Amino acid sequence: MVLSSADRQPVHTVYGGAQLFKPETPARLGAHALDLIRTYASDVDSFAQCLGLDRELAEAVLARVVTKLECEPVEDFRIDFEDGYGYRSEAEEDGHARSAARALAQAQKLPGFPPFIGIRIKPLTEISRVRARRTLELFFAEMSDLPPNFAVTLPKITDPAQAAELTDLLDGLEARQGFKPGTVKIELMIETPQAIIDTDGSFAIPKLIGAARGRCRGLHFGPYDYTASCDIAAAEQRLDHPACDFARNVMQVSAAGRGILLSDGPSTMLPVPRHRAPATDEQQAENRVIVQRAMRHHFDLVQRSLANGFYQGWDLHPGQLPTRYAAVYAFFLKSLQPAAARLRNFVDQAARATRAGEVFDDAATGQGLLNFLLRGVNCGAFTPEEAASSGLALEELRSRSFVTILDSRKA
């Protein structure tokens, strides 16, 4: 079941250089991801061993992963004009801005088009401001219509004035192109210390969000620029570094209650074999070890992000798509039955504090269980029918409110 994008937060954002973007790019990524599964974890036993899952859970997860990669391999794609693109001649970037927009228009007509999409421009700093603005203007000039859930990602933000500048620019571009005001959303990349703590010692993120004047859809964490800015040695710059945990915690607190989506960063350990075909048996075995190690590493990082309340992250390589979906589905499936039982018990007792086995439930826990089941349905880990074992219909889950659910049942 594919839910409407209004019900969803994408589980990932896939980044790809603008110079490489073609109408068929999402489908090609899915095909490459399926090839990796077939080569390195094609059956339930090898899949379970690779990711450290028990066989029953692995069987359910693998089936869902394959179906996902065949039908909708990419949930969110970002056409990248920053790190994944680099600095090129003015004429070359002009050409890629136009060609990427035309390719996007064609891609919308193809099956499996991502329900979320957008572009990442260069930073609005003194060095790259003119280039960033020109790329965005040229891109929009080619677009007669925007796909749903289109966003512009602003990297390396250090000052609310940069968010305000992008907002002003989008106001003008929407008016020029005849788009509904406010259609284009902004994602702010939190990858500098200045985006965490302002020069006056206060939290910076609320000011950044405010400067976007209602356009800010999400905050995306950039772990490698952030750790480098914190003077952490290159060998220690990683997604699960304690410095990154602090930044993510600040992001969560700053965005709480604002309806803003949070995204974690990427793993740079890619599932790429060392030896190309034709390879000897020994080389194939070495490839298998290398790829499966990277798969497990990515899987574990995604699970860690999920456990810490980051339900979206970056993927940089098609080989990361299988483990992204596997981690998400496993995270929700393994807790479906306990969560559903606890929620059913909670609702049956009319929101009074109860005991379900040895686990104590109060109202806050019940709200968390409700949110868990809704996210599980929205990401495709399980169906509304499976979530109904909680005793709630999908409409009740979507209400997100125990008061509404209980009042409707008392009526």
Tell where the protein language model's regions lie, with residue ranges:
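Expand to "…catalyze enediolate/carbanion chemistry for C-C bond making/breaking, isomerization
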Residues: 1-411
